């Protein structure tokens, strides 16, 4: 890139094997109108600092791997372009997560929260028909049939790519690392809205808990930073409505 403009890219570095604490290093990266932050990190790794660690995969904002803080805002590196910044960028790992190395964070709690809410369709147990262990083809079709209107109820919430940007944006997750978090609650709500699913009661026990929907104070920044416009804040608020219904029903129809 002869005669190209140069961006000063300040990157947080941390190797737990040799560093007592994270520190910042600055690299000069030539760029053009099409250079993404992910391209810039690749340039740094290939030509300036081979030990730089960061996550990436698809380059198309589909995999959700390259989330990081750009000038204190959660962004995907592949969707962030150097042309939109004037001379300086500060790149740090996603906020609210433990740092493993450089820009790589430990997503264990995030993954565990997603697993806990059972992010898959839970169907009814299939009864035996005519002595056969599996339901008929007609019954199978009836259990999986879905109209466009039924799909539209949850379609927006199904677009999540598990990038973790909403967790980095969430002040409540920063204060309470046990909070299920925006993405997990959104995913739970997505399946609760699916007419083919019968696992709502199992998920609501988590959403109704102390680390569920009521931990959210509705700042709304999670929806602002979402690269797929999933609107997790809306999903959480809808989850609060369902939780309130559960509470009222439990008061009117106590168990026992």
UniProtKB/Swiss-Prot annotation:
Main localization, broad class: membrane
Binding of [3Fe-4S] cluster, residues: 170, 216, 222
InterPro entries the record matches: 2Fe-2S_ferredoxin-like_sf, 2Fe-2S_ferredoxin-type, 2Fe2S_fd_BS, 4Fe4S_Fe-S-bd, 4Fe4S_Fe_S_CS, Beta-grasp_dom_sf, Helical_ferredxn, Succ_DH/fum_Rdtase_Fe-S
Domain of life: Bacteria
Membrane topology: Peripheral membrane protein
UniProt cross-references to PANTHER family, sorted A to Z: FUMARATE REDUCTASE IRON-SULFUR SUBUNIT
Listed name of the protein: Fumarate reductase iron-sulfur subunit
Taxonomic source organism: Haemophilus influenzae (strain ATCC 51907 / DSM 11121 / KW20 / Rd)
Taxonomic classification: Bacteria, Pseudomonadati, Pseudomonadota, Gammaproteobacteria, Pasteurellales
Gene, per the UniProt record: frdB
């Amino acid at each position: 890139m002869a005669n190209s403009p140069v961006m000063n890219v300040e990157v947080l570095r941390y190797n737990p094997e040799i560093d007592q604490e994270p520190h910042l290093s600055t690299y000069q990266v030539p760029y053009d109108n099409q250079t993404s932050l992910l391209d810039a990190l690749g340039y740094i790794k290939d030509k300036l600092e081979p030990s730089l660690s960061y996550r990436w995969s698809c380059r198309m904002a589909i995999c959700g791997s390259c989330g990081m803080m750009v000038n204190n805002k959660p962004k995907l590196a592949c969707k962030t372009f150097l042309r939109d910044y004037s001379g300086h960028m500060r790149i740090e790992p996603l906020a609210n997560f433990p740092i493993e190395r450089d820009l790589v964070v430990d997503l264990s709690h995030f993954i565990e929260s997603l697993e806990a809410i059972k992010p898959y369709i839970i169907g009814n147990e299939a009864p035996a028909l005519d002595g056969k262990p599996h339901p008929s083809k007609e019954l199978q079709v009836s259990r999986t049939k879905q109209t466009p209107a039924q799909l539209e109820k949850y379609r927006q919430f199904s677009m999540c790519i598990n990038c973790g940007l909403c967790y980095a944006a969430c002040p409540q997750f920063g204060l309470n690392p046990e909070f299920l978090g925006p993405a997990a609650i959104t995913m739970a709500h997505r399946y609760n809205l699916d007419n083919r699913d019968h696992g709502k009661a199992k998920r609501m026990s988590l959403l109704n808990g102390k680390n569920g929907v009521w931990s959210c104070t509705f700042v709304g920044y999670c929806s602002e930073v979402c690269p797929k416009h999933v609107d997790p804040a809306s999903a959480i608020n809808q989850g609060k409505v369902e939780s309130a219904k559960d509470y009222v029903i439990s008061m009117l129809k106590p168990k026992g």
